[in-house]
Amino acid sequence: MAKLSNDTNQLEASAARPQRMLLFLAAVVVGTLFAAVYLPAWKPALVASIVGDAPKAYWFLSRGSALVAFGLLWLSMAYGVIITNKMARVWPGGPTAFDLHEYVSILGIAFALFHGFILLGDRFINFRIAQIIIPFTTVDYKPLWVGLGQLAIYLWVIIMASFYIRSSIGGKSWRWVHYLSYLVFGMALAHGLAAGTDSAAPWAAGMYWGSAASLLFLLIYRISIKVFPQTA
């Protein structure tokens, strides 16, 4: 029976490969046609947005990547909390949640770094490399709130690195380092609300406060099951 099951799985995997290839080719064709039809009309605006007298592409990319980074930070923390409060057993499963917790965090750091460094191309805000790297040096634009965001990235990197040196620093130290995640989220939230140009928009405020509320709920649930454990 085990051999039959393995053979069936192999056949299903083999059948899936051509389907995936066809879907990939279809996506390439559709994307190519879309670009051929619309890119000529968009090209002047795109070029002006990148290399014109007042390029805005860098600012838009920074804003967009900031929102993505914040969302990934929230998602990584949510996975981390549901691992510890056993909710991951229901979905998506403990090992899957742990992997997602790790990889989503790496991706979030990448977007956060992109969010900062892409501003080197923006002529309006005119940041220098030192201002991107050194916290609280953006004297012309909200240095306190920008600095909190910069510190949050540094702490996030430290927390991420602790994944790979856990055996060296010990489980207790690793957990204490991981508790800094809540500080990182709070700093990122303050940075987004105070320094973000979209924070006054209802959708942005809803995203920020909704993510904070959901994490608070998960944390309270985690604490409650530890303080009041269920008995059989």
Language-model-derived ranges and their functions:
Residues M1-A232:
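Membrane-embedded alpha-helical bundles that constitute the cytochrome b-like, heme-associated redox core
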